Amino acid sequence: MPLLDTHSRVTHRPEPGFALLALVQATLIFTITLVAVPLPLIGVEFDLSTADLVVLQIAYGLPYSGLLLLGGSLTDRFGGTNLMRTGLWTFGLASLGAALAPGFDTLVAMRGLQGVAAALVAPAALAQVAALFPQAEDFDRAMARWGGISVLGAAMGTVLSGIVTTWVSWRWMFLVPGVVSALALLTERWLLPKVLSKDRGQSLDLFGAGLALVGFSAGGYGLAMGSETGWDAPSVLAALVLGVASLTGFAWHERRADAPLLPADFLRDKGRLAGAFGIFLAAASMGLVTFILAIYLQSGPGWSPLATAGAMVPYLAVLILGGGPSGQMVIGMGTRNAMILGLVLSAIGLWLLAGFGPNYVVEILPGLVLLPAGTSLVFAASAVLMTQGVSPVRMGLAGGVMNTAMELGPTAGLAGFMALASLRTEIEAGWSLVFMSAGGVAFLLAVSACFVLKRLQVTGAWK
């Protein structure tokens, strides 16, 4: 059984260390959406097709989601400190490379390398949080806040990218994750405990990691490109078949592997499974809002990038102001009730956004206020559900699964919902159908949570 050697250099309150980890986590999610607003400008500079822009959009999320389970396994084996340092160095250098990219191919490669690095950092950061808050009650409170941090990062990417690209080049956006990486590397020695694993003898499931990477990447690519090039395109069909085959092989292999990346019994817990679905849907909803509104406001009413970013400020404000109360509500009213309330609010917000139009105050703003209020609760409750009952030596696995759900939302989830838009001849009618459908899924999950989480209990640490 792995042992965790946690030698803390933190002699004061853990809040500064948690703040640093929160900044890192928000930046990892921020990096997903930082290209949302400047995509048209990048397309003009490099003379890109719509399909090229889709590739650029998903180049970060696909390796991130595909390698997170391996990142969790590496964290449990080598410890959060070593993995986070390695990941931050790589993340920072890749961000600098993206800022200086001379062409499209280099930019896509650097976005992909950012995703690889993020897959190391995310589960390692969660292991550090567990070391900062060793008491179960304190850790649950921390995780309730942690869930809201991720959704905040996504909204900040959309808002800041619009502001930055209005005044300077889009390339400056990639310096933000580079600066955060440097700050974390300079300060973690004094703010964070040293988390090292003593058991390095257990073999790594590299074959399973390869299947997961190919499955998530190929499947996500096929879903993303299907709506652009057509679902009958040979490249799309090949990617989807490869993705399904790889993920099927992954599931079969994990049930038989000696040291699986994702032990079969981990997601048998109803709470963890509900948390994974909640995170996936909330992340997909966020992706829908930022993607659709960023395109609509610039191509429909003809708003500037700065005005488009300004349109998302209320969304960001609700996330900032609601982050603390959401965590308190999860602890006060319980994860089940918080999850149900959050899903219902999210559903109503998405349904309101289905009526989007040029009148921002009447047709967009109400949904932009209600949706983040709901997703904040969903993320906070889901983060607690995903980590309750997990022993500290397996927190890397929990972080890997949680962040995989987070990354699949804006990639595979977004692509899956956007595929529904092709059922309508008019693009705006298709987008309205997407919002309605996402709201329907959120409401169905809320109803399901009423029964699935009715007798939720934590029976002990998952080892």
PLM region spans:
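Extracellular/periplasmic helix-loop-helix junction of adjacent transmembrane segments
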Residues: A36-L67, T106-L107, P301, L306-A311
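Membrane-interface helix termini in secondary transporters
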Residues: L41-G43, G72-S73, R77, I163, ...
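12-transmembrane solute porter fold
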Residues: P14-V37, T50, W167-V168, P234-L242, ...
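Helix-loop-helix hairpins in multi-pass membrane proteins, especially solute transporters
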Residues: G80-L206
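C-terminal membrane-cytosol helix-exit motif in multi-pass small-molecule transporters
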Residues: G178-S197, L213-M225, V241-A257, L445-R455
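Glycine/proline-centered helix-kink
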Residues: A36, P123, R145, S150-G162, ...
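Central cavity-lining transmembrane alpha-helices of secondary-active solute carriers
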Residues: I58-G72, A122-L126, V313-S326
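Structural signature of transmembrane alpha-helices in multi-pass secondary transporters
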Residues: L21, L28-I29, Q57-Y60, Y64, ...
